[in-house]
A protein has these predicted regions:
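Catalytic cores of secreted/periplasmic lytic hydrolases that degrade extracellular macromolecules
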Residues: 1-167, 171-172, 176-300
């Protein structure tokens, strides 16, 4: 039986956005259970829409009285499908949206006490993540996620880049905003300068593969916001990203793969295999960044 222990707040800084704070509270949930629900949430969404694995788990904690040891995959999938609604956008295209948690538990037939429990469990699960690095007392990382995620929604509206991808790449490319390139130029995506760039530049060391080091010229920005805006513009103006299917992809796994396919990074392991998409996907899963996408796909 999986037991929830006392929820421990990971930060007390009142200036940090509540949503970001709630992403990183510590609850003792077995890693295997988290992976199980993450994978099922992605499977149900079928790379078209993002479900919340935490909402699925909270519902099952009510249905099975917190004993998740005998859960059947089919049972979870049946509930998960209730979150998905087929709609038509303004252009007449068929799309999938996600129903609100309260609507689904009502459809399931939970009584008032069960609804209360489901919401309590969901609140406790808000801070659970797959990562062993729970960000406890690491306020600089929390603030970095907050800063980038706030701007990522605007980037999504303009260029259809999922918030999870924007935040995940920013973390990966800038080492949580701590890289020399990031500190010296506000370039948090590692975008190099080319003939199309007329702005400021800076030279910095970089590593393309697992064991090499080179010096390259990168774009320099006056702010993080400018870096994020140019990141979206850079992807949009380079036809190879359109050809790779980046802008049509609606799931973090397919957008990550499209970035790799288009050559955003050519990083390889010692066996010569491209590994950028896998690294980015794992980072997003580890910190539950895919739940940022859940918000933009919810039915209003």
């Amino acid at each position: 039986m999986i037991l929830l222990v006392t929820l421990i707040s990971l930060m007390s800084f009142i200036y940090i956005d509540n949503h970001i704070k709630e992403l990183y509270k510590e609850v003792n949930i077995e890693e295997s259970a988290i992976e199980f629900y993450i994978d099922i949430a992605d499977e149900i969404g079928n790379k078209e829409v993002q479900l919340s694995w935490k909402e699925l788990m909270a519902i099952d904690m009510v249905r099975f009285r917190k004993d998740l040891t005998s859960i059947r995959k089919k049972d979870v999938i049946d509930v998960g499908k209730k979150f998905i609604k087929n709609e038509v956008d303004k252009q007449g295209n068929k799309i999938k949206k996600v129903k609100r948690f309260d609507k689904v538990i009502d459809e399931i037939g939970f009584n008032s006490e069960e609804k209360k429990l489901a919401n309590e469990y969901l609140e406790e699960l808000k801070g659970v993540s797959l990562s062993g690095d729970t960000l406890k007392n690491q306020d600089e990382k929390i603030k970095f996620i907050e800063k980038v995620s706030e701007l990522s929604y605007e980037n999504y509206e303009k260029y259809n880049i999922l918030p999870s991808i924007t935040v995940g790449q920013a973390i990966l490319e800038s080492s949580w905003g701590e890289s020399n390139l990031s500190k010296n130029s506000n370039n948090i995506f590692g975008i190099k300068s080319d003939t199309r760039w007329n702005g400021k530049v800076v030279k910095a060391n970089t590593s393309e593969n697992y064991d090499d080091k080179i010096v390259a010229t990168f774009r320099k920005y006056d702010s993080i916001k400018e870096s994020i805006n140019d990141y979206g513009k850079f992807l949009n103006e380079n036809k190879r990203y359109k050809e790779s299917g980046l802008f049509k992809a609606t799931h973090y796994t397919t957008q990550a793969q499209a970035l790799e396919d288009a050559g955003y990074a050519t990083k390889k392991n010692e066996d010569g295999e491209l590994i950028y998409a896998d690294i980015l996907i794992n980072l997003i899963k580890n910190y539950s960044l895919q739940l940022l996408d859940r918000e933009i796909q919810e039915i209003e």
